[in-house]
From Swiss-Prot:
Catalytic activity line of the entry: L-glutamine + H2O = L-glutamate + NH4(+)
Species of the source: Geobacillus kaustophilus (strain HTA426)
Keyword Amino-acid biosynthesis annotated: no
EC number: 3.5.1.2
Originating gene: glsA
Keywords linked to the UniProt accession: Hydrolase
PANTHER family documented for this protein: GLUTAMINASE (PTHR12544:SF29)
HAMAP family: Glutaminase (MF_00313)
Transmembrane segments: none
Binding residues annotated for substrate, in chain numbering: S65, N116, E161, N168, Y192, Y244, V262
GO biological process: glutamate biosynthetic process; glutamine catabolic process
A Gene Ontology molecular function term of the record: glutaminase activity
Name the record gives this protein: Glutaminase
Oligomer and partners: Homotetramer.
Family classification: Belongs to the glutaminase family.
Length: 308
């Protein structure tokens, strides 16, 4: 088993922090705009239950778009591939994650579940009789994956996003017009913004990454937390679409299945080897953590983590 050196990891974090001045926090969401752009932390979770970390890994980060991969896993378990991919595609895009442009082409279904339009469709498919019931089902799934029953969501961030989610509302109405979703838009927005506001530490993120790295199995008990096929689909989307419209560049430079969020979080899964959680709020122009990507690039090269 490869041993990760903590002193080396601390040095990598300090090196990557130097790039923070070139990034910017997601201030278009008021609650996220309060983040310290110079913050950077990482946790690596290995199959033998070892955690190596650097930076302040007690800081909680909201999942934002990282939640898309978890919601997709839950919906695939509930409804199966055929039903899910009847409503959302599988292809990557070079358009920004919030773009409506490709929806205007035939068919009108979103290109993939990692862009906002596709994620809204996936969230609309979470089973339950009310927003609170559906959110609780998702939270229960997240808690099992992370091995942490205390995980919840940030009401402040959820409220901030709900009040400013005008573009996502427009995506919902477009999707409703084309009969891809059929529920009340405000209820869907409430569920989606609370989903994005689920918060956890880098260690929790790394534990979820490890579950994916182990093909959906619990690292302690080997119990399947999701079917192997679902874990495989999730990791495939993480490679092709997980880093927005710079996923190709990330695959070449880092080569690890990963999903980012505009909070500055990154969830990564190195098949069979480890899960990684990163938090660095300074974003690049694509919405990915600038310092986090630099850190993962250094880590991948040092420990030969690329899957390619």
């Amino acid at each position: 088993m490869l041993v990760y050196n903590q002193e080396e990891l601390v040095r990598f974090v300090e090196e990557a922090k130097q790039y923070a001045r070139y990034g910017k926090v997601a201030d278009y969401i008021p609650a996220l705009g309060k983040a310290n752009p110079n913050e950077l932390s990482i946790a690596i979770y290995t199959p033998d239950d070892e955690v190596v970390s650097a930076g302040d890994v007690t800081v909680k980060v909201t999942l934002q778009s990282i939640s898309k991969i978890i919601a997709l896993a839950l919906v695939l378990i509930d409804r199966g591939e055929d039903e899910v991919f009847h409503k959302v595609g599988m292809e990557p895009t070079d358009y920004p994650f919030h773009s409506i442009a490709k929806l205007e082409e035939k068919p009108a279904k979103p290109l993939n579940p990692m862009i906002n339009a596709g994620a809204l469709v996936v969230t609309s498919m979470i089973q339950g009789g009310s927003v609170s019931e559906r959110l609780e089902r998702l939270l229960a799934f997240v808690r099992r994956l992370a091995g942490n029953e205390r995980i919840s969501y940030s009401d402040e961030v959820a409220r901030s996003e709900f009040e400013t989610a005008f573009l996502n509302r427009s995506l919902c109405y477009f999707l409703k017009q084309h009969r891809i979703i059929d529920e009340d838009v405000e209820e869907l927005m409430e569920l989606y913004t609370k989903q994005c506001a689920i918060e956890m530490t880098c260690i929790d993120l790394a534990r979820i990454g490890l579950v994916l790295a182990l093909d959906g199995r619990d690292p302690h008990s080997s119990e399947p937390l999701m079917p192997l096929d679902v874990a495989r689909i999730c990791k495939t989307f993480m490679v092709t679409c997980g880093m927005y419209n710079s996923s190709g560049e990330f695959a070449i430079k880092v080569g690890i299945p990963a999903k980012s969020g505009v909070s500055g979080g990154i969830l990564a899964a190195v098949p069979g080897r480890c899960g990684i959680g990163v938090f660095g709020p300074a974003l690049d122009d694509k919405g990915n953590s600038l310092t986090g990507v630099k850190l993962l690039e250094r880590l991948s090269k040092t420990y030969s983590l690329s899957i390619f």
